Amino acid sequence: VVTMPLLKENDYLIDFDMIDEKTAQDAKYMIVSYPNNPTCGVANDEFYKKLIVFAKKHNIMVLHDNAYSELLFEGPGHSFLEFEGAKDVGIEFNSLSKTYGLAGARIGFALGNKEIIGKLKSLKSNLDYGMFLPVQKGAIKALTQDQSCVEKTRNAYKHRRDLLVNGCKSIGWDIDMPKGTMFVWAKIPDKFKDSETFVKELFDKTGVLVVPGNAFGTQGEGYVRMALVQSDDTIEHALDMMDKSGLFK
């Protein structure tokens, strides 16, 4: 298993030029996920086209996780499968957990390359015998009926994003505005030596708990992840406690 750093200077996109020839030749598949958790990176058209060319050149299977496809705030996003040649090299996964709030149902779907889907079906048939039927029927209803709930969910997350990010900026913590997902990926203040030190002090002084970036890998050091899952009142209370703590002065 080879991991790839997702860095701010490359908009948290995979840099294919950093993948050495031996790694590329030995690789059997590449797991890609945009919009990305935890970095909030969003892939553009050029990235997907490069991904397909790279996969074809090195005979690599692409497994694209598009769970946050509907949680984009700066215009519509893309499916990997929209691009020419994508179905030749990979499949795409999606989930009803984020779009429809069905996290507890544990249901999603995959589509794309027929051969890969066939192998996935064979694997699933050996692991389990399918989802509980009422859950499947509920998922079908979610996918086929009025989709205004999706826009409502997106707007709610966007509102919380704006509230949290602008609030952090107002107390002296200058963090980036994410383009998508239900998270905020924030660089820790310069005066703290590492993510865990910042997380501990923030919690001790304010009761606000965030996730240290290094929990997601070594390249996450220096960052924290915050989830946009709390009410406006809770976010405002957290910002007030953070402001009073003096940590951002």
Predicted regions and their residues:
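PLP-dependent class I/II
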Residues: V1-K249
